[in-house]
Amino acid sequence: MRNIILPAILVCFLISPVYCESFKDFQAKQAQNQEVFNKKEAEKKKNYEQEQLKKFKKYKTKKQQEYDAYRRSVNEKFAEAMKQKWTARKKNAAVPVPKSKEPPKPYVKNDDKRTTAVKLNYAKIVNAESYDDPEPITPVDLEIPEEEIPVNFEQDYKFLYHGTTCKAHFFDSMHFSLPDVSEATVSEVWKKLSSDDFDLLLSDCFDLKDDLRLGDWGYIDMLRVMSEHFLGEESNEAVLLQMFVLSQSGYKVRLARSGDKLILLVPFRTDLYTYPYFILNDGKKYYIIDKEARSQSRTYQVYETSFPREKTASLKMPGTPRLGQARGAGKLFQSRRYQDTFAEVVTNKNLIDFYNDYPVSGSWADYVRASLSDEIKNTLYPALRAQIKGKTKLEAANILINFVQTAFNYKKDVDQFGYEKTFFGDEVFYYPYSDCEDRSILFAILVRELLGLDVVLLHYPQHLATAVNFGNEDVYGSYFVIDGKKYVVSDPTYIGAPIGECMPQFQNSSAEIVKIN
């Protein structure tokens, strides 16, 4: 047996180098074949992707052509209808801001005795407005150029909006003039505006609205500033350009004429105070936004033709506008009961000016949803979070409500301004005084964003307070049951009162519940 095994081992030993060399060749050939295969697959994939991209570009070009054709058709019909005689309308006088009766003075709770907790009744529930942004008549940025269009921003037009540098493509060739404001002349200029020359400008305007987070009112106002910068303050050309961009942006707008002056008319989803208006053929109120135009004669001619899929503007804010910085002096705000709860806050004058021009609205939920600016959040929120860290939701809410109750001085709007004015959150930190509306709005913002709790506003006759849903946490105090959930009264103007305490004069009053979400 040994005589057989040993020769076999010797043979294997002698041929193994040959075998190994052949195996290496085999492996190399396999690797080479795999590389060739991979290259072919990569080439096939590349060809496939190029073919798909080619098809997609062809599709995009076709869709862009369809949109362009649709847009041309809409604007041509709009311009042709503009030649017809405009409708004579009479202006309605502006509705003044309602003067409220004497609001309750801040009620101070001087003892720690708790009142009896009761379930409270409410008169009705006001749901928050739901709203979709208007959509442009055509997506002008659908077809992306093969090469980036060269832009020399030193030659590009720039304009300032509330201290914020804005850029838009408005070149010399885009300038136009209106020798008169007859139907025929305005119609011809509208056709010029509808050309491809203005597509980049439209795209810039859409981007500015989103980038600056302006909301509808801010967008309308920004377009006024831009149009007047390019075409002259209070000029008819500026009004027509503003009207054109708004119509292409998807907004319901109309054009009026008084003598030799063109005037922009804009309806809103809520009534505006202090703005004269027209009631047009669709039954809506169309407001004269331009301050200078409000003093024109009562009789106007109005072009009332509508655009497809146009939407009515809203005063709802998508958030705090992103404006350039104009920092003022810092102010210290400190809680009276919780002395370690304080913050030095700096406000942005550009934002304050923006809010100061904002129409007075009775939609308090909009003020809450606008939140606070990042500048204030960056200093205020870390200070407040440090004090509520590790606390229960109730303990944290009591710290926040005492801060709002005692860190700010109280004065009625009429005494501070001579008229009713509701503050956005940042304004509470800017002006020397605030009232019940302002404090309730600020407290609602803080509770929603720092504690993540749902809040409703309580509208009593001449008073505004809040109620907070603490979820599963058992909280003592007077409360409402809304949609099967318990909301505990929290009054930022009842000085020194903890969560759950209702001002005595409102304990038996039925509040109107204003939802925020």
Question: For each predicted feature, which ranges?
Answer:
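N-terminal propeptides/low-complexity segments immediately following signal peptides
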Residues: 20-98, 103-109
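Active-site neighborhood of thiol-dependent amide/isopeptide-bond enzymes
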Residues: 229-242, 251, 411-465, 469-471
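Hydrophobic/aromatic-rich core segments of domains that either
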Residues: 253-283, 384, 389-391, 438-517
